[in-house]
């Protein structure tokens, strides 16, 4: 049975090549029944079977089953783009997920996959199979290969693929040199936004966004797939943290904080030319010229007819709900927005997911915002153009307007947070616990974080359809930091040991013009670095915590992991949560870039009472190392407090951060120093 489970992963290998061709390290071939072959191959099915089966490393017989009705998923042409933001595509994907989830065992799933893989749009097939593997009880131990392995065309310069085809055809597998991806290939230095392209176009960051939306889909026939613990709040918090991080990166590069996209009638000043090609659609991703305005959509092919005024109506209804602190339900009654669950209700309304309390009334503001922007170059399909990068969760974060749109959405959520009662001492204090200091120790100067460029390699071999087999490595440049430790001095004046929840954040200290931030501005720029629980015994305690253990990030190896390197066998605890573990902020982007002279920031630590924060649950074998932005699979979010606590609410009594401090908190001024040099991955220093 575990063999059949592993066979499912072969469908991710060279996704546009038919599954009767050799797949994976073992050159496995699916032996499919004659009636499964598409019409174009049916007359030669025997010859095909003999041709690819003769030197196969392993033959996989496929059970001939009565196939479900696939008419709906097959409405999306094989060689089109696929977007979860487009309601029609969402409906087709929801039906296919339903079919995959409904197969009675793994053998039947393998059978229907072999039929679908030859006919269904590869992007949609990959997405639906990934969601099914993540959520079926009998496939939970499987590690889905990273999306950049299957579809590298969504993440890098198309020139790389021409070189890769040349290398794989000419050079034998073991002797291939990595192909270098240029770092700045989408714009010149004349474009100020290009200064933060290293963040927007980072492969790991875009993979994080894609994987988060894979783990938290907003549509499926089975509500349990969508209705996960606090998913609406997590939607708010994960994107809020992205905006905080992006704003800090901008200030490190002498740019102002991102301006909200809040006037839907105004032109979008920023243009974006993605320089990406879609291998499935055989088209270049369309650009958006500077000064483009979103216009009413009328695209019958996508079943979209929507006016810009609809966005404005949905927004106004949303603001009205916050003003009234209650949401209108379909039956006309009001659901109060309380301080415990209000943000979760609003998050699901905003996104909007199928668990939105009233989708017909509050609409689909977040998703349709993406759709309007992504079709701004061809709103009525007269030029037969497909959507731009804002229409795909794997590419949206490359575009500067993504951050402008989400800065506005974040602002709307903050309006709700402003209506909540500020935290009092009862919520902030931890009696008998005093944090006397926090500091950073690393390889060099104390309280200094060091950043630089690093070159790493990713294997494109699995995504190179119709080319000779073997690894094809691409080398790309990304930001990296030297690892460091937090050193926290805590004094427990009580008579017994207690468990504390340590919350570590970092924020800039001065704004674009060099003026110190007010507390209200600074709290919105607080970046969560780590959160962990630890015992505090009576007297003085020195607690050291390694940066590599952050609850926010996943290690480099998991962002770019090779599916063949999965720990342990499927079904064991070591592998059981590996797929969920693919969700997390990339560790190489934990620390902002800083500046060559040293960018001033403030490190903040708070110790709260674990007894107030804890969620009673068994976490054995659970992947909880990146729980801050991703939660834990099949479990509750592992912290009862609001996400972003203690900075999620305003504190009118505090004008500066030092006014806000309690005895169980401490701060330390530190600097982030960037050195403009590049090291190879694996080198130290």
From Swiss-Prot:
Family annotation (Pfam families): Hemocyanin_C, Hemocyanin_M, Hemocyanin_N
Subunit record text: Heterodimer.
Post-translational modification (record): The N-terminus is blocked.
Species assigned in the record: Bombyx mori
Cofactor needs: Cu(2+)
GO molecular function, one term: metal ion binding
UniProt function note: This is a copper-containing oxidase that functions in the formation of pigments such as melanins and other polyphenolic compounds. Catalyzes the rate-limiting conversions of tyrosine to DOPA, DOPA to DOPA-quinone and possibly 5,6 dihydroxyindole to indole-5'6 quinone.
Catalytic activity from the UniProt record: 2 L-dopa + O2 = 2 L-dopaquinone + 2 H2O; L-tyrosine + O2 = L-dopaquinone + H2O
UniProt binding sites for Cu cation B: 366, 370, 406
Propeptide: 1-51
Active site residues according to the UniProt entry: 351
Expression by tissue: Synthesized by hemocytes and released into the hemolymph plasma.
Record's protein name: Phenoloxidase subunit 1
Bilayer-spanning residue ranges: none
